[in-house]
A protein has these predicted regions:
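Short amphipathic alpha-helical surface micro-motifs
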Residues: 1-2, 190
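Active-site beta->alpha loop and helix N-cap motifs at the rims of alpha/beta catalytic domains
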Residues: 2-15, 19-148, 156
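Catalytic alpha/beta core domains of metabolic enzymes, predominantly
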Residues: 132-133, 144-198
């Protein structure tokens, strides 16, 4: 993902990492660390670990934490490490976010609650509860094609008032709405849709 804004907190170019597995189906820590180092050596400013590309919904919480720790150890301070800790369950998201914070991640990527289709008030309450329960900067992830619910522009504007909500990964595919967010907030906005960027 590429930032639309100048001097973004997490860097300009972030890569959503895959989660490598062994032939036995376990998380492959060595491969994850090798991949993370390779991506940073190749110019990535930040890595998203166990986001939706990293199969977070198929991992146990312990496997997620293994990945957070492994990637942070591999890259240290050479790149920002964001942990994909968003789920469709607020309490679960808070717990996983706190565990990511304990591993020293630089930020959290929180996808919109999927499947349940909450109202915009529910979306806002979900994200605010996680932000209130942690001390880590947060990037919201708006990908309605996968979650079935957008984060509407007015909801994003309201969430941008929270001191820990600092960025948006926008995969909505609507540059008009992206422009409104850029004009109305101080959020760092990243493109979550390569076709819209390139």
């Amino acid at each position: 993902m590429v930032a639309f804004t100048d001097k973004p907190r997490f860097g300009t170019l972030l890569t959503a990492m895959v989660t490598p597995f062994t032939n036995e189906g376990a998380v492959d820590v060595d491969a994850a660390q090798s991949l993370a180092a390779h991506l940073v050596d190749g110019g990535c400013d930040g890595l998203v670990v166990t986001g939706t590309t990293g199969e977070t919904s198929t991992l146990t919480d312990d496997e997620n934490v293994i990945m957070f720790k492994a990637v942070k150890e591999a890259v240290g301070d050479r790149a920002a490490v964001l942990a994909g800790t968003g789920t469709n369950d607020t309490a679960h998201s808070i717990n996983l976010s706190r565990r990511a914070q304990e591993e020293g991640v630089d930020g959290l990527l929180l996808v919109t609650p999927y499947y349940n289709k909450p109202s915009q008030a529910g979306v806002k309450a979900h994200f605010e509860a996680i932000a209130d329960a942690t001390d880590v900067p947060i990037m919201l992830y708006d990908i309605p094609g996968r979650t079935s619910i957008p984060i509407e522009t007015n909801t994003i504007k309201a969430l941008a008032e929270h001191p820990r909500i600092v960025a948006l990964k926008d995969a909505k595919g609507n540059l008009g709405e992206t422009t409104k967010v850029l004009a109305a907030t101080d959020l760092d906005v990243y493109s979550g849709d390569d076709g819209m960027t390139l």
